[in-house]
Amino acid sequence: DVYKRQEVKFHHNPDSTHGFCGAALSSNVIHWWKNDAGKWQWEKIIDIDNEPHPDWPIPIPGVMSAILVSMDDKYLYLNNWLHGDMRQYDISDPHNPKLTGQIWMGGLLGKAPVVNGVDMAGGPQMFQLSLDGKRLYVTTSLFSTWDNQFYPEIRDKGGVMVMIDCDPENGGMSINPDFIVNFGNEPNGPSRCHEARYPGGDCTSDIWL
């Protein structure tokens, strides 16, 4: 467990001591906080099971390469780059997260090879959430050498960016059917896409006071 710790995210509320870390290869989420006695505590709160695959000698790990916390500190989002799914958890109680949404796009499990008419190469990788918590943009390229190893077809197809509609009130996710950016069609492409940013601020770069 807790192997290849990748991204660290804190609550946006500066008075909160709660934070989260995603472990990529073991596909866990760790939660930490300071207790009433002022001592730091930690616990594992999410586990993603490995999945069998006929072409692999071992079950495929999810490879949770990124996590993100919504601006209101209500939801945690995570990806499973090799499995091909994005997940939304309600972390109103950070000790007991609840799965409230899941979508599939690409991945090695074959559950969503085509999204909005585009052949997917890769799986959900980096992602960014709008400040209002309603739009999650997800890209598919992790690192070119690893892309080529696990998704060799990405050399010819390029990457894509998908928009996921999120319900910040009740939870839930769905792929927006009217939005997709196919970087395989870029001039001098095929190109790949990694990280998205909002010019007016996003849930990674902002806090609230």
Question: What does each model-found stretch correspond to?
Answer:
Residues 152-168:
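Beta-propeller blade signature
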Residues 31-43, 88-100, 163-175:
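Short loop/turn segments immediately following beta-strands, especially the blade-tip
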